[in-house]
Amino acid sequence: MERLRNLILENVAMFNEAFPNRFCHSPDVISAISHDYKFTYGQVENEIEKMVHEGVLDAELSDWYEIKLL
């Protein structure tokens, strides 16, 4: 799952660089990764949830709809 985590970080980092004062919509990240790589929507969603709990990502809402790198 290290590859998946890196893809999530890359996608969120690109968004945060372009829009530093906004949170990234996690469904956009999930859809982009699951469309371009061999990960299911659920796998990406679960990994984002883990990364929020680990403190790697910050979530604005309790359902992890909007995420940001810490």
Question: What positions do the PLM features span?
Answer:
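Short alpha-helical segments that sit at the start of domains
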Residues: 1-20
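Alpha-helix N-cap and coil->helix boundary residues
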Residues: 3, 24-25, 43
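Short, cationic-aromatic polyanion-contact patches
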Residues: 5, 62-70
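Short acidic, hydrophobic short linear motifs in intrinsically disordered regions
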Residues: 19-34
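Short amphipathic alpha-helical interaction segments
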Residues: 38-50
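A short, conserved structural fragment
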Residues: 52-62
